[in-house]
């Protein structure tokens, strides 16, 4: 698709979005029942609107899929598309060139900030109405309050991992007080605790199961609180460097994840593929997900369009736009040794191509064929000729290579798929927390507590499932497209010291969640973003010319800058992040 087509379409979208900072923080959702007339029906509608708020996503201000902010900014993926100038702000993020002037037609970060605060405003609107009702008037009042607080916690959490210091807005602030709330009202640790209060309330006031799918429950709140405490455990100084790992916070992570595990309400999907296929939404592995649907009575339906740029550009069934391409480093990371373990030290020595990834070629982790489109391999678990991935499907291989992301896409004949203009939307959910994440969060906490032996069986659960997930990746005759070799850690094939366990855990997270976006945030949490990403760039510069000037700057690039328009609007009340 030509650049001017993208601009025309997205300028029209922005026309619906651009409002003043004040209005998106204090405007009530459409259909809001005015103060003085709270009703149960009105409160229920506002809670529903708050759920919709966390999924009101778009390509110019993503809040559900973090592929731009978490994958492209890491060593997992390139921006892709039609060269570096195609959706240029995303190229700036990839290059860590984050001080470019505001581009009104396609800004990215400012609209992500805005969309999250719109979602927070919806949660607060629901809470204000619920607070005016009594338990006698509405027997589900406490449950709905807990749900709204969970949703508010989610949006504040995401803002925090993106920007670090953000204004905390709750339902008790007046419009005037909102305008006087600084993004530095709380210290880093205090802000974590403020956000945690919402998840703690939700955990203590929600049932373990809900009668309607998609609603937050007690265990989802416990899992999210565990995720927050894990991030908080890695204590940072003002320059974003990890200076301490808080053991008490790690123990909280163990206890909270154990609550989820022992409930028996969740398990790994039998086949890894089922996390990325239509028909398996809200399955046993989905702890909390953002819900989408193919039709809600509107023209476009309630579809996820945030990944609409990421389909194979040259595939006739799609036709656009070739973004979010796996990096060479990411592809290489799936290679395994003769024992079926990752090539921790040598994985990036050899540049793998489709000619290497064959039934008789290098041994690889099976998750490669769930994550990456490779020439000659079935795409999206379809083995008919029209879905065998081809190099001709890649939009700009001279810049970004021949691989394509695959997890977030769906087949063009799926009942979940709809093409709106040049872009693709799907109704499949976006998982925010999977059960695999719960297992690996607990494993990480155990390792950092010096109890790495407790972590090994947790990691092995994830690896065992990967080993058993090869049925859907095969050709029509039953043969595998790659030479799969993966083994569990038995304590002797890798000496299970704390350092080795940590290395194994971090590798497992990368492969399990490849191209799902956690990677950059993991690197920052662990305090290894600068050495990891600059080592990645040093090697990638020998492969990809467009990265020649890319450089990660420690003490700055761990977080995005506060959008300048927010600083201007608050007349300097908001402080810019260090380094910008």
Language-model features: locations:
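Membrane-proximal, proline-rich intrinsically disordered regions
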Residues: 21-73, 556-559, 563, 567-580
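Long, intrinsically disordered, low-complexity segments
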Residues: 20-22, 77, 102, 116-119, ...
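Short coil/turn linking the two alpha-helices of tandem helical-hairpin repeats
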Residues: 160-162, 167, 210, 228-240, ...
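Conserved, well-structured interaction surfaces
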Residues: 39-40, 44-48, 52-57, 83-163, ...
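Glycine-rich, aromatic-lined ligand/substrate-binding cores of catalytic
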Residues: 284, 288-396
């Amino acid at each position: 698709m030509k650049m001017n087509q993208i601009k025309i379409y997205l300028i029209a979208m922005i026309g619906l979005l651009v409002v003043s900072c004040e209005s998106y923080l204090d405007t009530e959702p459409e259909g809001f029942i005015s103060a003085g007339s709270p009703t149960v029906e009105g409160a229920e509608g506002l809670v529903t609107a708050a759920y919709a708020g966390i999924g009101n996503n778009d390509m110019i201000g993503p809040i559900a899929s973090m592929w731009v902010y978490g994958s492209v900014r890491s060593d997992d993926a390139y921006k892709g598309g039609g060269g570096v100038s195609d959706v240029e702000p995303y190229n700036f993020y990839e290059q860590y060139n984050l001080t470019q002037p505001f581009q009104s037609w396609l800004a990215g970060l400012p609209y992500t900030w805005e969309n999250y605060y719109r979602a927070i405003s919806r949660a607060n609107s629901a809470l204000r109405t619920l607070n005016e009702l009594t338990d006698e008037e509405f027997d589900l009042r406490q449950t709905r309050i807990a749900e709204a607080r969970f949703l508010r916690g989610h949006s504040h959490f995401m803002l925090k991992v993106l920007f670090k210091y953000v204004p905390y807005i709750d339902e008790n602030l007046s419009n005037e007080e909102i305008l006087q709330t600084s993004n530095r009202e709380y210290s880093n640790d205090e802000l974590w605790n403020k956000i945690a209060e919402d998840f703690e309330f939700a955990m203590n006031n929600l049932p373990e199961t809900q009668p309607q799918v998609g609603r937050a429950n007690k265990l989802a709140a416990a899992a999210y609180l565990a995720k927050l405490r894990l991030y908080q455990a890695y204590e940072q100084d003002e320059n974003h460097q990890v200076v301490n790992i808080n053991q008490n916070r790690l123990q909280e992570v163990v206890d909270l994840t154990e609550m989820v595990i022992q409930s028996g309400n969740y398990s790994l999907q039998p086949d890894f593929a089922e996390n990325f296929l239509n028909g398996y939404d809200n399955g046993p592995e989905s702890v909390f997900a953002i819900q989408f649907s193919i039709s809600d009575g509107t023209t476009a339906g309630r579809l996820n369009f945030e990944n609409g740029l990421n389909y194979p550009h040259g595939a006739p069934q799609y036709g656009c736009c070739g973004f979010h391409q796996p990096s060479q480093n990411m592809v290489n990371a799936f290679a395994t040794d003769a024992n079926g373990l990752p090539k921790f030290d040598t994985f990036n020595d050899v540049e793998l191509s489709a000619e290497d990834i064959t039934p008789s070629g290098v041994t690889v982790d099976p998750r490669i064929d769930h994550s990456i489109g490779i020439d000659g391999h079935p795409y999206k678990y379809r083995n008919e000729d029209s879905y065998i991935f081809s190099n001709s499907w890649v939009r700009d291989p001279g810049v970004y290579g021949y691989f394509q992301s695959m997890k977030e896409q769906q087949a063009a004949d799926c009942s979940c798929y709809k093409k709106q203009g040049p872009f693709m939307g799907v109704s499949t959910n976006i998982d925010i927390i999977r059960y695999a994440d719960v297992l690996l969060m607990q494993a990480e906490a155990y390792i950092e507590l010096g109890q790495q032996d407790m972590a090994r069986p947790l990691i092995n659960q994830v690896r065992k499932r990967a080993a058993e997930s090869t049925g859907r990746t095969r050709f029509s005759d039953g043969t595998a497209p790659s030479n799969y070799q993966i083994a569990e850690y038995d304590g002797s094939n890798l000496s299970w010291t704390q350092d080795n366990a940590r290395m194994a855990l971090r590798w497992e997270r990368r492969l399990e969640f490849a191209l799902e976006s956690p990677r950059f945030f993991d690197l920052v949490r662990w305090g290894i973003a600068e050495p990891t990403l600059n080592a990645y760039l040093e090697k990638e510069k020998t492969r990809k010319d467009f990265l020649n000037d890319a450089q990660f700057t420690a003490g700055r690039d761990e977080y995005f800058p506060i959008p300048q328009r927010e600083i201007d609007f608050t007349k300097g009340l908001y402080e810019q992040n260090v380094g910008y």
